[in-house]
A protein has these predicted regions:
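Extended, folded cores of ATP/NTP-driven motor/assembly subunits in large transport
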Residues: 1-410, 420-421
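P-loop NTPase motor domains
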Residues: 35-53, 64, 276-279, 292-299, ...
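Short glycine-/polar-rich loops that comprise or flank the Walker A/P-loop
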Residues: 53-56, 109, 490-492, 517, ...
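P-loop NTPase motor core of the ASCE superfamily
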Residues: 100-101, 540-586, 729-816
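Charge-patterned, long linear interaction tracts outside catalytic cores
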Residues: 125, 439-445, 450-452, 457-470, ...
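Conserved P-loop NTPase motor cores
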Residues: 312-314, 443, 450-484, 497-504, ...
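Post-Walker A helix-loop "phosphate-sensing" segment adjacent to the P-loop in P-loop NTPases
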Residues: 485-495, 508-509
Length: 816
């Protein structure tokens, strides 16, 4: 029953001397693709299958395991900076928590493709005939030795080299359409051990040795080494196998396809993709495909057509009506014959086998029922042939033959391409900051926010900026806080603008990094007067001048297009910039010194703001020193008593206090430019909460683009936290945003805007429903590779949940 005779690199010889070349198909992301994109993938896979005019193809979807500990250890290697010790301790605690929740390993589906290598016809001459006779004779001798001694298997070196050349050509053809990796001996070892009931070993940690002895004309391997991964006691029952190892036992059952009722319409027939999301337990699938070349296929179809016509004639002669089955079959055969004749395409004999395993019989029965129901819903009828379990088991082994002909399905390449082989949902990186898990696949999602600027292969953006959008209470602030916290732990530096003063308790709530948290609370005390004056807060005089103009035009409503007022204001600001004592109060003095009706008017207008509420923070007389230090790893700037306008309020409707509040945000955000221009070797984050407040005004929009562009050059990411995707959807900004997070929204226009922002089909009802039905803490995530999926944000630690939760506390009455 064991088909493998010899393995060399990714080549497998079977007992019938057929040679297969095996590859791992690197999975491609399939979630949230438009119908058009799905058809492009479908077409590529159809061409991949159709390029082989003869031979066999063996496709395997195997549920392997990946080690959580290994991923977390790799993540620790990314940690740098002052908080390295705290970060490593946090990651270790996180690892233990994750392992206790989901075990040491998580299921990871891998896709393997084996192609039979077809021998090219050699020129018929005496030399080749002698060579062929000699090969046959030596093979006979080896077979006798092997039968008598049963100790080694040999393979002529000429034979190996011949097939290796053919494999190179094949690999070149395949890799034009899909990313593939040649299998190694470890892969084959894992595959065999997995099929024989061994689990609990992470794929990347598994090792298998197959020592070879290379002689002058042949290479030898020990037969024992070849079959070592299959060690176990197998007990065959009618409908299942019992696999027993020293320390455990498992039960395995095999299904095969009995019939496909009706059509499997694409896109919606991607069985390989959907079953990854459907089942909470591992399921393996094998497709053994034999290619029937066009002429043979046409002959078979025409013979079938004759049989059906005979049945039709027989019914006519007997005076009875032809059954509807025969009429339908005749129509189908006519259509198929025409299709094959025109396209010259091959047909495919498909043996489709599903492997279900479980630790005990009851669980096996439950899992088998679930698999059967899933396929039933797709109009695919499965059977478990009694007494054929061991034979179907052998179909999963590399280079195996089709075991049974009773359940063969004749299909075209369209059908095989529509099954979604290799399709999966991938999100984020393999290591980095653990943010949560994919809602569809349950796989952990890791992010590396600083990676975008490194130009990693496959990324579709080099923008470090991120956007967090969604309606109130969906979890965007929580997710944003969590990402910033871990980015700081991993060695980054952050400046958070906290307009609602929600982060004031972080020092108490996060004691392990309290010494690196700097909270600057700008209250309306007289001591803080002038602290936010552009000339005080900005190091660069040119930046200070430009910010002063922005703030004063914003407050007074003077447009740069106003030919009377703007030049007067501009001249006054320039005079102050060139003087020794710089401050916004001096601009008023300069305007009064001008002493024209226009300058007096502007001076009075600006002066009317100076003593209004907390406006004195913006105005200094040039004697104030900058007291805001950003040397800590985590810096939070709060301005007390800010009153932000409602989201729907237009700029013309802003009240005076709202105008002042937004101007404060603009000043602090511009101050972030100095922070961005600090040490380029450190990844920095400028976090702008309630970003919509200044993104909706012209000065704020210009500033945001300036921040993002400066950030890209200086390894700094600007994080926009806002309620609507519209705020960050303007082309100039949208194209400079990398990571995108979208939380629940119920407004249909907002949903469409968000989907468009993510670059996915906004009119697709399924996409709209996904966004509408998101639960609290779930978000749509687009990673640096342009892949989109739904993530459940998972803080792991309760103290982080309490620290970052911005919801108002619930009053509870204590029951005595």
């Amino acid at each position: 029953m064991f088909p493998i005779k010899y393995i060399d690199n990714n080549l497998v010889w079977n007992k019938d001397n057929e040679v297969f070349a095996y590859y791992e198909l690197i999975p491609y992301n399939y979630s949230f693709l438009s119908a058009e994109q799905k058809f492009i993938v479908h077409d590529s896979f159809r061409q991949l299958i159709a390029q082989s005019r003869e031979g066999k193809i063996h496709a395997l979807q195997i549920a392997t395991e990946s080690s959580i500990r290994s991923m977390q250890e790799q993540s620790k290697k990314l940690v740098t900076g002052k908080l390295k010790e705290v970060a490593c301790q946090k990651i270790d605690e996180q690892t233990e928590a994750l392992v206790s929740m989901i075990g040491d390993n998580q299921v990871d589906y891998r896709f393997f493709l084996g192609f039979k290598l077809m021998v090219t016809e050699e020129q018929l001459n005496l030399k080749n005939i002698k060579k062929s006779v000699w090969l046959t004779f030596t093979e006979f001798l080896h077979e006798v030795n092997h039968t008598l001694m049963n100790d080694f298997v040999s393979m002529p070196n000429d034979e190996i080299n011949r097939y290796m050349k053919m494999e190179k050509l094949l690999e070149n053809k395949i890799s034009r359409r899909f990313k593939v990796r040649r299998l190694e001996i470890h892969d084959f070892g894992y595959l065999m051990e997995h099929l024989y009931g061994r689990d609990g070993i992470a794929y990347e940690d598994y090792e298998y040795q197959l020592p070879k002895k290379k002689l002058n004309k042949e290479t030898l391997i020990k037969y024992y080494d070849l079959i070592r991964p299959t060690r176990c006691v197998i007990e065959e029952s009618q409908r299942y196998l019992r696999l027993e190892h020293e320390d455990k036992e498992s039960y395995v059952s095999y299904f095969t396809v009995n019939a496909i009722v009706g059509e499997l319409d694409f896109p919606s027939s991607e069985i390989f993709y959907f079953q990854q999301q459907q089942f909470t337990f591992p399921v393996d699938t094998s497709m053994n495909v034999e290619i029937v070349e066009n002429r043979k296929a046409l002959t078979t179809v025409r013979n079938k057509k004759k049989e059906l016509k005979d049945l039709d004639n027989h019914a006519y002669q007997a005076g009875s009506e032809t059954s509807s089955n025969v009429v339908d079959a005749l129509d189908s055969v006519d259509e198929l014959e025409t299709d094959l004749d025109q396209t010259k395409e091959s047909m495919y004999k498909l043996s489709y086998v599903i492997r279900v395993s479980a630790p005990d019989l009851d669980e096996l029965k439950r899992r088998c029922d679930e698999v059967k129901d899933f396929y039933d819903d797709l109009n695919v009828k499965l059977v478990r042939p009694a007494g054929d379990m061991l034979g179907l088991h052998s179909e999963f082994l590399p280079a195996s033959k089709r075991y049974i002909n009773d359940y063969v399905q004749y299909v075209k390449s369209d059908f095989l391409a529509g099954l979604g082989f290799g399709a999966t949902q991938q999100l984020g990186e393999t290591t980095g900051i653990y943010m949560g898990y994919s809602v569809d696949t349950g796989r952990n999602v890791y992010l590396q926010p600083s990676l975008a600027s490194q130009g990693v292969k496959g990324t579709v953006t080099n923008a470090l900026a991120s956007a967090f959008v969604g309606s109130l209470g969906g979890g965007k602030s929580f997710c944003n806080n969590l990402l910033v916290y871990y980015a700081v732990l991993f060695g980054g530096q952050a400046l958070l603008l906290d307009p609602k003063s929600e982060r004031g308790n972080w020092k108490e709530m996060l004691p392990e990094i309290a010494h690196e948290i700097n909270i600057v609370n700008l209250t309306s005390d007289k001591d803080n007067a002038g602290l936010l004056d552009p000339f005080v807060i900005m190091k660069n005089v040119k930046d200070a001048e430009s910010l002063a103009i922005d703030i004063l035009t914003f407050l007074t409503g003077i447009s740069s297009r106003d030919g009377e007022k703007f030049p007067v204001l501009r001249k006054a600001v320039r005079s102050v910039t060139q003087s020794d004592s710089r401050g916004l109060l001096h601009v008023i003095d300069e305007l009064r010194r001008e002493d024209t009706p226009i300058s007096r008017n502007i001076a009075d207008h600006i002066d009317s703001f100076t003593d209004y509420d907390f406006a004195h923070l913006l105005f200094s007389d040039g004697t104030v020193e900058n007291a805001i230090s950003l040397d800590n790893q985590l810096n939070i700037i709060q301005v007390a008593d800010l009153v932000l306008p409602d989201k729907d309020t237009t700029f013309e409707e802003y009240t005076t206090i709202e105008l002042l509040s937004v101007s404060m945000l603009i000043v602090i955000s511009t101050f972030a430019l100095d922070f961005i221009h600090s040490d380029r070797s450190i990844f920095k984050i400028v976090d702008l909460d309630e970003a919509w407040a200044f993104l909706n005004v012209a000065q704020g929009e210009t500033l945001s683009n300036k921040l993002v562009r400066a950030g890209r050059a200086m390894q700094a990411g600007v994080y926009f936290v806002t309620q609507s995707a519209y705020d960050v959807s303007k082309e100039s900004l949208k194209n400079n945003i990398g990571l995108k997070f979208a939380f629940r929204s119920t407004d249909i226009n907002e949903i469409k805007q968000t989907l468009e922002f993510f670059g996915i089909d906004k009119d697709d009802e399924n996409n709209q429903k996904r966004l509408r039905d998101l639960e609290n803490g779930q978000c749509l995530l687009q990673d640096l590779y342009g892949r989109v999926g739904v993530v459940q944000i998972h803080p792991v630690f309760e103290e982080l949940l309490h620290a970052f939760d911005t919801r108002p506390p619930v009053q509870r009455n204590e029951v005595e």
